[in-house]
Amino acid sequence: MTPNKEDYLKCIYEIGIDLHKITNKEIAARMQVSPPAVTEMIKRMKSENLILKDKECGYLLTDLGLKLVSELYRKHRLIEVFLVHHLDYTSDQIHEEAEVLEHTVSDLFVERLDKLLGFPKTCPHGGTIPAKGELLVEINNLPLADIKEAGSYRLTRVHDSFDILSYLDKHSLHIGDSFQVKQFDGFSNTFTILSKNEDLQVNMDIAKQLYVEKIN
């Protein structure tokens, strides 16, 4: 499979997490390609039984498509762990490197890497690393945006975008850190959280990309 097709598969998977319906327009925007290019790729992927058309959701990954996406995430996240633990990369540097390397490493390399790293369960951003042959099921899947009550929470996963990681680094908020959700302002769609004695205003766009767990 070509790297381009692999990127399309990941894109469709990620849109399906964020939005109710996956459209050609949204795929084109995220992939930064023309709508005709998306149409052509969609035809190929449908013919290869990677995706199927769905009236409500736009497109759905087939079992084969989800299997391939899971393998890609496994490669990507193991590479991220290696870069942080063995090459002293920071968490905001690893995503782009892993994006390139995930398309080039062999299955044997990934197996050896997994063993070298001690079979890690999560990547530096808190994302689940599926075991060999298993489908990706995120362990940390409660977004801050869905929190309904004030209280103590722990940051368990973040989307690995440069802007989000830079925002968290600026405020010294990292995976595993605890913080207080003080209130939610429905008018401005903003959470007020207390982290390390600092009040932070977190808008809904950011809150959708931060995953948490309640601390009892």
Task: List each model region and its residues.
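Mid-protein regulatory/catalytic core that forms ligand/cofactor-binding pockets
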Residues: 102-209
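A short, conserved structural fragment
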Residues: 47-54
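Alpha-helical residues within the helix-turn-helix
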Residues: 29, 46-47
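Short acidic, hydrophobic short linear motifs in intrinsically disordered regions
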Residues: 18-26
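Key DNA-contact positions within bacterial/archaeal DNA-binding proteins
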Residues: 36, 92
